[in-house]
């Protein structure tokens, strides 16, 4: 696979002498082999490629056939692979045009037993799609008895990130797919079984979230997911895309205010509470601003801090004594989730954010009115009904990135149509801070926010801390001061909570964390073994 690397650059900002240097992400681009894709398209029955017909014209006709089921498929700058029976679809369209009934009355019959896509977004950076399947409806998968359809994700990347020090997961061949996709490899990383292959010069990734362990009731295990993935990959067909003349991507600059804020202070990225990492591992000292964005909370002040290792007041009490500046990173705090960017290989997938103290505190650590959450960027919503996680996905000529919000109430999100196929504008109200985690009042009143970027191993979590710092500076109109010395005693303010550094809370005695079934205590690197921890669908943090 040919790539065009883009060297990481420093942001042009007048940082203080002590502040860490803000970085831009390092990107690579796939060089798409459109002649090879054209040759593959030419063999599709029903397309009737004409002599001397150019590849753009052929793909234009192919896109016209597919777009009813894959909206805006022509926007993809890479060839789109999907489980769509394009040959039957083309034959049926010819029959319908001549007044002959087609062979399929229901559009879903074109998807080889899979449901029509729950999400599809194509653009200059590539495409991402989410399909689903009810295993009990498929003869060869009917022994996998689950009440809900299983989701399968597929991505084709023109733009992807090159992450420093990301551990290389163990790769295994899949003999059943080798003939069709030479070099395809299966791996397990960050809670997903993943299938990586290159075609037409483009890296593609198919992934299914699964539990790596013994069979459990109502839980998809990875040996079952493997069978579903093989069925899915065998159904893939080349169904669209458009050759595009695009310049190499240039990550946008994140502009910081020139004036210092008199109050906002923060510890640098990776400065998690001592002892709070998995096996005392440190945090991830990542100064990368992965994208310019709006801060996810509508109003300031807001506080980035630990929900576990910082002293907490009782339920329903005013939180002003708990949450104050300075901010502290808690990406890679000890959790049961695999995160490749964490030095210990396991940890917190994002950053917890607490809003200002409640105007009207209620019981069970809730607020009335609740604090509003807004879209950090203009983009496409990716979320199925009942799911707790909501993503905003951005796909343009310079970026491919997704932002995830957790702990909003699924019922309210369903009622307000915060679902796939909806687009939002930056700053648009999308919900409220809540306490939902698998159930109401399942966690403290806060927002979990994380960022995922595409890599040659698929979508992975990266440290959102500095991205949030810069977004918050934009919200308050002043640059924060990074702290390097040990926390000192906070000085009380007559007008509200302390604004100087607070004394660090002593973390609890180091304990061996309780790991989930299937996690290897002797392995600290995601993907080092197929027996590794997984995160529950759409509820990880």
List PLM regions with ranges:
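Short glycine/threonine/proline-enriched tight-turn/helix- or strand-capping micro-motif at secondary-structure
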Residues: 286, 290-373
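Sec-dependent signal peptide recognition
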Residues: 2-9
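Zn2+-dependent peptidoglycan hydrolase active-site motif and core
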Residues: 340, 347-349, 363-417, 444-450
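N-terminal signal peptide c-region/cleavage motif recognized by signal peptidases
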Residues: 12-16
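Acidic, glycine-rich catalytic/binding loops that coordinate metals and/or anionic ligands
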Residues: 254-293, 374, 413-428, 439-541
